[in-house]
């Protein structure tokens, strides 16, 4: 009698697959709605999951296809839970109409790291945006003089330190480099004489993060710097505060929660979509931010790839009502 090792699908097999699909769907539902329940040890996986949270949605069609291939109506029904959760979280982000209002001035943040263009080319692109305040991060130190020269005709005022630069059409005073506990300045604070009153502007680049097999999500130094920056912002007596820069993280990441408690993201109020900025060729996460206190964003947008590994963010602003 011939013997076959092939498994035949039957009620028992379908039931087993249904249970697996249902458990997977339940776990995905919990991760989407309650990512803060994921522990950050080992490897700070909780923060990593929060950083890429919208992308968990790609697992939903995978579960649905699995259920359909196994002929499991209950499995199909189980996938509805994470689908509804994802839609509740992110459909409003994707479909919300950005506000349209007159801007008193515009601000741009741009991590210019990368070797696909020149300081002069970037300067031309920056000037063409019409921005009044420009924060540039990761400026190669040998190129800083070229940036200053290329931007000088449009921006009469500037403050630079290490790889950070702040350029302005408005007068700057009280310039202060801030190391935030690191070996090099992670921020520059300056008071800009913006329309409607002074604004304390922070040009920021927090420490870089990596995902490594032996270490996990390496956000320790970034989180420490973010907490230090949040403390500085909380103690800033200026009525209007703006943080421009590369925070090397999503605001959904619990590591940036101290900043989110004191400042409001322009993207949430005046943007459309996720506003991903990195990597420039195919952005998958928003790590470049405009955070505000005492200012109202009238518009905000992620600009096209200008030759860096990040995309710039341009935001229109006016005094808060």
Language model region names:
Residues 113-127, 138-321:
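Soluble catalytic domains of enzymes that build or remodel membrane lipids, polysaccharides, and related
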Residues 2-148, 321:
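N-terminal, active-site-proximal structural segment of metallo-dependent hydrolase catalytic domains
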